[in-house]
């Protein structure tokens, strides 16, 4: 699936999988042609067609991989400007992996299992990307930080523990992953397939 979002400051890119989970294949923030998102723009804002922000794929992958729905404001890519004066857009290509998603609140164990084949972890995050998940009886200040990510270390440690096994328990705890955001109540979000 290919999605293009013009960067006007309030625009949000919305990715969704009806079944399975998001896997970002390609992502570009910038401009590579003179026709995309040109509506109402002067010609001088469309001239640079070799403009791309480095790190776009990594940022989107961190935010969206393993989720069923993902919203990203184009503002997150404005940390630096790859081509000043050029009107940019976010172009994303993603696929939906037929994965099982397991969510476990901090302090519990995530039981991953395959009836057939063995576990292959595609993405895992220990932290918080949402205010509603694992929020029961928790004070608001423990739920406020929704940009608490530790995806690369969580994915590698979970994969180390579970890949190629038919079942595996992973603790949602600081002892395994460290504490990516002190004071925030976290959860472990794992997307895996059986193969």
UniProtKB/Swiss-Prot annotation:
Entry's Gene Ontology molecular function annotations: galactose binding; melibiose binding; protein homodimerization activity; rhamnose binding
The keyword Repeat is annotated on this UniProt entry: yes
Domain SUEL-type lectin: start-end pairs: 1-97, 104-195
InterPro entries: Lectin_gal-bd_dom, Lectin_gal-bd_sf
Temperature dependence: Loses half of its hemagglutinating activity after heating at 50 degrees Celsius for 120 minutes. Activity is abolished by heating at 80 degrees Celsius for 60 minutes.
UniProtKB keywords: Hemagglutinin, Lectin, Repeat
GO annotations of cellular component type: cortical granule
PROSITE patterns in the cross-refs: SUEL_LECTIN
Pfam families: SUEL_Lectin
Function: L-rhamnose binding lectin. Has hemagglutinating activity towards rabbit erythrocytes and human type B erythrocytes. Hemagglutinating activity is inhibited by smooth-type lipopolysaccharide (LPS) from S.flexneri 1A and E.coli K12, but not by rough-type LPS from S.flexneri, E.coli K12 and E.coli EH100. Agglutinates E.coli K12 and B.subtilis.
Official protein name in the record: L-rhamnose-binding lectin CSL2
Organism: Oncorhynchus keta
């Amino acid at each position: 699936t290919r999605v293009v979002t013009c960067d006007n400051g309030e625009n949000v890119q919305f990715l969704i999988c009806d079944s399975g989970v998001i896997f970002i294949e390609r992502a570009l923030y910038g401009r590579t042609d003179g026709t995309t998102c040109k509506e109402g723009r002067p010609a001088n804002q469309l001239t640079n067609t070799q403009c791309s922000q480095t790190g776009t794929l990594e940022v989107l992958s961190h935010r969206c991989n393993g989720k069923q729905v993902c919203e990203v404001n184009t503002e997150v890519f404005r940390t630096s400007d790859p081509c000043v004066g050029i009107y940019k857009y976010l172009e994303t290509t993603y696929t939906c992996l037929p994965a099982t998603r397991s969510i476990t609140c901090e302090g519990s164990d995530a039981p991953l299992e395959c009836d057939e084949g063995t576990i292959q972890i595609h993405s895992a995050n220990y932290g918080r990307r949402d205010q509603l998940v694992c929020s029961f009886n928790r004070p608001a200040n423990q739920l406020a930080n929704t940009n608490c990510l530790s995806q690369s270390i969580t994915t590698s440690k979970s994969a180390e523990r579970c890949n190629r096994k038919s079942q595996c328990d992973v603790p949602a705890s600081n002892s395994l992953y460290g504490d990516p955001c002190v004071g925030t109540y976290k959860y472990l979000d794992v997307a895996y397939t059986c193969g």
